Amino acid sequence: MHLPPLEPPISDRYFASGEVTIAADVVIAPGVLLIAEADSRIEIASGVCIGLGSVIHARGGAIIIQAGALLAAGVLIVGQSIVGRQACLGASTTLVNTSIEAGGVTAPGSLLSAETPPTTATVSSSEPAGRSPQSSAIAHPTKVYGKEQFLRMRQSMFPDR
């Protein structure tokens, strides 16, 4: 799947509107929009990293991003959602009124909605690189090849997490 490139933001800051709570050690890239409509809120816990141009728009409830979660560039979260501890959302992932469990991983360009069950790939760490995993509709993401390596790399790059 081809994903269009993200344009660099005009501003080197992020924008927050409404009831938005951000922990002191959160890393937020330029061009991020955090919008909480009336009677809604956004909570971002310690150690979260939000990538360039992401949009988090709370409507009709809360969006809660738990400690250590990583949102890559261009992520869109709309409605009500919980992103679990140490979850990783791939670039240009869209969540609409749905949540990701702790440690969950989404592929770049994923679209997850409360109306349709997520489709995730189940891959064991013993599979050789280059094989395409079979997709199956399941309720929660499962083990993803390379997750342990990613977590070690993130720990070495960001030791305070």
From Swiss-Prot:
Induction behaviour: Carboxysome size and components vary with growth conditions. When grown in ambient air at medium light (50 uE meter(-2) second(-1)) there are 74 units of this protein per carboxysome, the numbers decrease under low light and high CO(2), and increase under high light (at protein level).
Segments carrying motif Encapsulation peptide: 144-161
Biological process annotations from GO: carbon fixation; photosynthesis
Gene Ontology molecular function: structural constituent of carboxysome shell
Compartmental location: Carboxysome
Biotechnology: Heterologous expression of 12 carboxysomal genes in E.coli (ccaA, ccmK2, ccmK3, ccmK4, ccmL, ccmM, ccmN, ccmO, ccmP, rbcL, rbcS, rbcX) leads to the formation of bodies that resemble carboxysomes, have densely packed paracrystalline arrays and RuBisCO activity. These structures open the door to generating carboxysomes in plant cells to increase their photosynthesis and productivity, as well as tailoring bacterial microcompartments to specific metabolic needs and molecule delivery.
Gene Ontology CC: carboxysome
Gene3D superfamilies hit by this protein: Hexapeptide repeat proteins
Record flagged with keyword Transferase: no
Knocked-out gene: effects: Cells with a disrupted or mutated protein do not have carboxysomes, instead have less dense inclusions, do not grow in normal air. Targeted disruption do not grow normally in air but have wild-type growth in 3% CO(2), called a high-CO(2) requiring phenotype, HCR. Cells have a single polar aggregate instead of carboxysomes; RuBisCO localizes to polar spots consistent with the polar aggregates.
Composition skew (Polar residues), residue ranges: 116-137
Key words, A-Z: Bacterial microcompartment, Carbon dioxide fixation, Carboxysome, Photosynthesis
Record's keyword annotation contains Transmembrane helix: no
Disordered, as annotated region: 111-140
UniProt remark on domains: The N-terminus interacts with CcmM, while the 18 C-terminal residues (encapsulation peptide) are required for interaction with the hexameric shell proteins (CcmK2) and are predicted to form a helix. The 2 regions are separated by a linker.
Family: Belongs to the CcmN family.
Function: Required for carboxysome formation; the N-terminus interacts with CcmM which itself binds RuBisCO (ribulose bisphosphate carboxylase, rbcL-rbcS), while the C-terminal 18 residues interact with carboxysome shell protein CcmK2. Required for growth in normal air. Beta-carboxysome assembly initiates when soluble RuBisCO is condensed into a liquid matrix in a pre-carboxysome by the RbcS-like domains of probably both CcmM58 and CcmM35. CcmN interacts with the N-terminus of CcmM58, and then recruits the CcmK2 major shell protein via CcmN's encapsulation peptide. Shell formation requires CcmK proteins and CcmO. CcmL caps the otherwise elongated carboxysome. Once fully encapsulated carboxysomes are formed, they migrate within the cell probably via interactions with the cytoskeleton.
Assembly notes: Interacts with CcmM via the N-terminus of CcmN. Interacts with CcmK2 via the 18 C-terminal residues.
The protein, known as: Carboxysome assembly protein CcmN
